[in-house]
Amino acid sequence: MAKSLLLVLCFALVTTLGWGYSAPPTGTTEPPDVQTVAPTEDETLQNEADNQENVLSQLLGDYDKVKAVSEGSDCQCKCVVRPLGRDACQRVNAGTSRKEDFYTVETITSGPSCKCACVAPPSALNPCEGDFRLQKLREADSRDLKLSTIIDMLEGAFYGLDLLKLHSVTTKLVGRVDKLEEEISKNLTKENEQIREDVEEIRTEMNKRGKENCSNNILDSIPDIRSALQRDAAAAYTHPEYEERFLQEETVSQQIKSIKLLQTRPLAPPEVVKPQRPLQRQVHLRGRPASRPTVIRGITYYKAKDPEEENDIEEHQDEFFSGEHGMDLLIEDQLLRHNQLLTSATRRPAATGRSAAVTADAGTTSAGTPTTALPSARLPASTAAPSTPDPAVSASVEQFSTPLPTTSVSPDPTEEAVPTPFTQVPATTVAHTATQQPPASAPPSAAPEDAFVEATHTAPVPPPPVRTDSPGKDSTARQGTVPPGPTLSPEEEDDIRNVIGRCKDTLSTITGPITQNTYGRNEGAWMKDPLAKDERIYVTNYYYGNTLVEFRNLENFKQGRWSNSYKLPYSWIGTGHVVYNGAFYYNRAFTRNIIKYDLKQRYVAAWAMLHDVAYEEATPWRWQGHSDVDFAVDENGLWLIYPALDDEGFSQEVIVLSKLNAVDLSTQKETTWRTGLRRNLYGNCFVICGVLYAVDSHNQRNANISYAFDTHTNTQIVPRLLFENEYSYTTQIDYNPKDRLLYAWDNGHQVTYHVIFAY
């Protein structure tokens, strides 16, 4: 064994010496006086990058080639090799060889004192050499071969491996890897230095800003909120001293003091409760002549809600002033006035059966004259008792059977005067149960002076039914308590349309995009709540995740200063989510479920499954151009767009448009349409005024709105409206009916489009 290893080492030494003393290659050589310009480092790296695919082929290109080793001066060697074919070696192994089944290596030498040797690995001459030796080794036990024979076979195997060449190749590869590591280390050092500089700049900027954190800005913005709310006399919802129980007691005390100026008959004094906090709101009263007595039976107050609580569905118990005095505040000048309607600037026309005053049971007065309505003041139909009736109060109300005359109230100077005789309100209109219905929304800003609002305290009365007025809607009185979940009646849907606006008719043009910000990854979505009074912006970065980020306004969004974040209990998929009426609607990742997440209470408010959705079980982890389940909002409310199988046709996948109940996420067959749009054949889609629009491409700069489906007429057209994807990678398009804008996420850029209607 030692002898064999010694032979291998000697042969390697001879081969190395032979290569070292080999004659230089013939041909032209470069003159020594010509200076070559060394390539720069950038050129070397560029050449390495260009030739990176040929590195291994260059290193291993002559691995199986025959090499000539020469020794001596002026020596020329030539090797002529005739290898054995694969079929020939198989015939040799099978014992059916032919005369031509052999290989030769011929050496041709020229020149004095020249020694040449042709070196060829067995793999280049006999392709079956390795298989032959392996077969012999396997048969060694049965043939009882000697150890020397096995050593010879191993030597041949090592020789066939060409270890010297492998060592050379390995050395070159190691050298290249070392060079790569050195370059990477330099680049990492530069990047680390740049990162340190950036971190220092960020720290310096943060130190300069100081207390400009979003959490501290909440306290700084309270004076702005107060100044904005001073335009509305009843909107004092941001201060704890204006809680409803204190407001009622203090206001009642003020009004009772003002009534002392009037000559009234002795009344049972009400239960006096000392105000726990000083009253900051002044109730403006106008003095009345002492010779005209006034009867006060009940007082109704309105309390606006916090913008964060405007969509909260909580039923507060009514805290009326006790009605045992038999008084009713009918003086127009002493009512709390509002500066704007509750819903929108456009006021709905009043119905013929409505009037400014509530219709009472007695249709005629004591003098036989029909009852007329007051233009500005409202007469409550009854003194609504608390939800838990007090026995003493009930007894006093039942004993009170004599109708009390009331004084007529002069109308507002801005309105037409209507002669109003004294009216009688029978005591039978008193109800012992009352329900409180929350106002539709908080007043956004100033409004006409003649408009005022009452909290809708409805009281069930025998026929004729009592109607209570709330700005922008008519609602009949109902008995019992309101269910905890909100129900969208047609009147309330009209209120929503009044808040976010009504349809402007046919879509005519979509203007070019306006880039608002650059934020986040290539895929994502940003949106605003069309029913909110503030300008908050919500962002979902990427098409998969579970964190919703909130910004107070667009300016904070541009600065990257988020004000809140919501960790969702279930992840979303896609970019088709929306924020509507204080809730986040999205499709749970890798499921058929849609979820409504209440942003104020931070819990899942509703959950539903789309049974007919054409869901791909093996959804690939890549963006496919649009979301499978897409929510949309327009002037009519909440919509849902998703693919489903067309049962009536040839079981093709079609896009379904369905009106979604925002409360329980339910859909109705009457408001569900199967469109002619096909899956994966469009870019993004959105809904405007009950019409579904689809863009033909999401990654072409100049695209078109190539499809429109009208839910009013059940017709579909090809509008061919131009739509520009400025950054050629739009992953979200959503319509906001409040702003009349399209919000889009285009390759990490947040852009908006103005919507222009034909009329």
Swiss-Prot record:
| PTM characteristics | O-glycosylated and N-glycosylated.
GO cellular component labels: extracellular space
Q: Name one GO biological process term.
A: signal transduction
Give one Pfam family.
OLF
Q: Where is the major localization of this protein?
A: secreted
The alphabetized UniProt keywords are: Coiled coil, Disulfide bond, Glycoprotein, Secreted, Signal
Presence of keyword RNA-binding: no
Which residue windows are coiled coil?
40-68, 179-209
Q: Which residues are glycosylated?
A: N187, N213, N704
The segments labelled Disordered in the record are 346-396, 456-494
According to the record, the segments passing through the membrane are none
Q: Which cysteines are joined by disulfide bonds?
A: C503-C689
Where located?
Answer: Secreted
Q: Matching InterPro entries, A to Z?
A: Olfac-like_dom, Olfactomedin-like_domain
Q: Signal sequence: where?
A: 1-20
Xref: PANTHER family: OLFACTOMEDIN-LIKE PROTEIN 2B (PTHR23192:SF37), OLFACTOMEDIN-RELATED (PTHR23192)
The record's subunit annotation is: Homodimer. Binds to heparin and chondroitin sulfate E.
Know the name of this protein?
Olfactomedin-like protein 2B
